[in-house]
């Protein structure tokens, strides 16, 4: 695995590395024009048809306890739709579970590659990992308290899982170094912060002020995570851009500050 990503090498993805062949291809494309000057109207109709026929990505399961059934009925009588809150809680649970695995992968690469000046520390990565796991427990507890099944895959949880599929792929790819992994973590933290903000707003709007206060503590921690990851990545990119970069620190000698 390479520790840097910006070294010059045998990258042949661009046409500039083969001017003769690329000129032939360009000439052939100009000589053989498309047989039909169509647009995307037909494919748009197909997509619309699929959208009309689709049954969606699932549904929120019914309450798993009598308490949940009663609470749902009361909330609906008040004019609110509690299943929306359950759905978004399921989304948070799925994302925090994924976040835990992302930081487990980051720690594995840290152990192999070490860190750099101003880069991640073992203590910092472990702190965030433990926070993610704690947040997963918090959301699970909230779901149980509301009488919902925390093991169910809600529609928003499904969407979150699909939309973030690329993040675990980056972290687990042996070709990706620790800086590449931090880029994936930065994307995750940006999404995570926005997700908690919306969940808190929804909780307060539905009268779950106690839960909202606890969620705010989670958001405060997530804001710290975002600052830490952004700082680590920025330090790594800046260091690599130097003409004579400082050698990468060994994992056992990684700096102790968390940020």
Put a short name on every predicted segment.
Residues 2-259:
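Non-heme di-metal
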